[in-house]
Amino acid sequence: MKKAYVFLADGFEEIEGLTVVDVLRRAGVDVKTVSVMGRKQIQGAHNIPVDADILFDDINGEDADMLVLPGGMPGTLNLKAHEGLCDLLKAYD
């Protein structure tokens, strides 16, 4: 089974993050939402709280077939500020 991580940070665009999760899960992909905020509850760009499946520190980024970074402000800035995520993206092949 294919595996995907959708990385969430405070201020992410809810439609961009959650639609991807919905469509991929319907297609049979093992999708995990990953918080880069150090806590599972993330606040979307439109103040919608979302509980991530897992924290960034608890994933093995090498086992994913797909990495998804939703847009939104300030979500993209919060993703960019996460050193571990930046390192993972640079190493991802």
Where do the PLM segments sit?
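Extended, subdomain-level signal for the structured scaffold at the beginning of enzyme domains
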Residues: 1-92
